[in-house]
Design a protein with these regions (language model features):
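Active-site-adjacent structural elements that line small-molecule/cofactor binding pockets in enzymes
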Residues: 1-250
């Protein structure tokens, strides 16, 4: 169940508690150019007891990899091991327009970020030298005083699940290779295999055997109503399409 991210967080928390009592097993919070998802997820962790809580999604450009790892570990701790880190590249309209940073190397950045996060959760002394991220920062790019560090706290879990929101063939292939789960959008079950079957198969062929089977979280809309209301409810789907095409697309 995707929880309301554009309204009152307290109302969303009350709704989440009601949904939990009704049997919903996972609640997702989005982050666009809205309230940040982390504050809401932390509040939800205090107001729920059993349902999993996931970010859907935290953009990879809005936080450093280590901050993303720290945030996920903190949310997993306060929720007693119920957090799912959902990440994604978002799009240039939001990343460059709202966050003011270049939208470059989205798939490569995503892979590096996950690698760094998993090092942090294992409490390794974190070093990384990639195309996008360098830990510690090289001396010629800063003061030269940076040192390799490890997380002070002991995480609730060293294997916090990471889900990726992806659509393009290469991104879906990487998702199937390295992520715990996949968050597609506008998912049509009858057409999924013809669109994504090959990249999923290619990614799974390279998947580390230590990873669990990839979960798929495909959103959908459900409304219980009479026929008179059905047409109006169907029209509400136009809003989400317009948001993705006009408000976030490029």
């Amino acid at each position: 169940m995707t929880l309301n991210y554009s309204g009152d967080p307290r109302a969303a928390a009350a709704e989440a508690a009601d949904l939990e009592r009704a049997g919903i097993d996972v609640g997702w919070v989005a982050e666009l150019y809205s309230f940040d998802a982390v504050s809401i997820l932390g509040y939800l962790a205090a107001k729920t007891e059993t349902m999993e809580l996931g970010s859907s999604i935290l953009p990879i450009y809005s936080r450093t990899p280590t901050l993303t790892a720290m945030t996920a570990a903190g949310l997993d701790a306060v929720s007693e091991g119920r957090f799912i880190l959902g990440i994604g590249a978002s799009g240039p309209q939001v990343i460059e327009g709202w966050h003011g940073v270049p939208y470059d190397r989205p798939i490569g950045r995503q892979r590096e970020l996950i690698d760094i996060c998993r090092k942090v959760w294992r409490r390794e002394v974190v070093t990384h030298d990639g195309p996008s991220y360098h830990l510690p920062l090289p001396a010629d790019q800063g003061t030269g005083l940076g040192k390799p560090l490890k997380l002070i706290n002991h995480p609730k879990r060293a294997d916090i699940p990471v889900y990726i929101a992806s659509l393009g063939p290469k991104n879906v292939e990487v998702t199937a290779e390295i992520a715990n789960g996949w968050i597609p959008v506008f998912f049509h079950p009858d057409k999924a295999d013809s669109v994504w079957g090959d990249p999923i198969a290619a990614g799974l062929a390279k998947r580390d055997a230590s990873l669990p089977p990839m979960e798929v979280v495909a959103g959908g809309a459900l409304s219980i109503c009479d026929e008179a209301t059905a047409a109006r409810i169907r029209d509400l789907g136009r809003f989400m399409t317009a948001l993705y095409v006009g408000g976030m697309g490029a």
